[in-house]
């Protein structure tokens, strides 16, 4: 059983309103000099584990767990009354189940596979499966080692990509899709020669990022003299592929 509590606070202070008007595109809180945001997360996990080798039939260790997470985000908000500020609380919860299968003993083969699925709450449908392993073979008096690691993850964009309220940046993105990431990487090692060959590929679908949305400031002749700062969340609905390869001798 584990209990994890995270408390995070951010306070933004800016007294130079003239500079804010010049530098930022938006000043949602008017001349207010301070805006705050708070994040609280409480995660409770209960699990049961069967250790590798606890009897002659147990060739691998097995763990199963159940997790519940409560999250609260407090953001400064405005009202219909000019100058009035309130704290808007966004409450989220997520219930997930998971398991782990691992083999650490012996010399030939080792592996670890960890999976988790959100079955209810804000993150329902989110899942991740991660695995890594190594195979060790004797060949011509040398040890040849093959390492493999891979994962597939389908994850909800983080809260602050979905909702954010502050003095200069403000958005509500209720239509963001889950981010799908898959990766496969392998490494071949020859101990005697000190040779390593590594290759990997990763695919990202619905890549979500913070984009520069600044606008140009022009003089009376149309020349760009500067920019007013702004940012926005963007999501690329296509696929992004990353390939890597390395030979080390």
Which residue ranges define each predicted feature?
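N-terminal extension/subdomain marker
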Residues: 23-28
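Exposed, low-structure sequence patches enriched in small/polar residues
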Residues: 1-16, 31-249
């Amino acid at each position: 059983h584990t209990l994890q509590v995270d408390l995070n606070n951010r306070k933004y202070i800016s007294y130079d309103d003239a500079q804010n008007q010049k530098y930022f595109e938006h000043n949602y809180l008017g001349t207010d000099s301070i805006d705050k945001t708070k994040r609280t997360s409480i995660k409770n996990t209960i699990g049961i584990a069967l250790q590798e080798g606890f009897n002659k039939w147990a060739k691998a260790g097995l763990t199963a767990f159940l997790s519940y997470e409560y999250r609260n985000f407090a953001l400064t908000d405005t009202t219909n009354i000019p100058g009035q500020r309130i704290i808007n609380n966004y409450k989220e919860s997520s219930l997930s189940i998971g398991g782990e299968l691992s083999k650490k003993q012996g010399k030939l083969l080792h592996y670890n596979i960890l999976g988790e699925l959100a079955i209810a709450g804000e993150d329902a449908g989110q899942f991740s499966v991660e695995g890594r392993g190594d195979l060790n073979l004797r060949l011509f008096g040398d040890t040849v080692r093959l390492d493999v690691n891979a994962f597939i993850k389908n994850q909800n964009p983080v809260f602050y990509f979905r909702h954010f309220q502050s003095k200069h940046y403000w958005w509500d993105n209720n239509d963001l899709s889950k981010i799908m990431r898959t990766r496969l990487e392998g490494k071949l090692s020859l101990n005697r020669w000190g040779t390593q060959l590594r290759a990997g590929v990763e695919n990202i679908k619905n890549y979500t990022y913070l984009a520069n949305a600044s606008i140009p400031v022009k003089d009376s002749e149309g020349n760009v003299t500067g920019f007013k700062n702004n940012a926005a969340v963007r999501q690329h609905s296509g696929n992004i592929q990353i390939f890597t390869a390395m030979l080390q001798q």
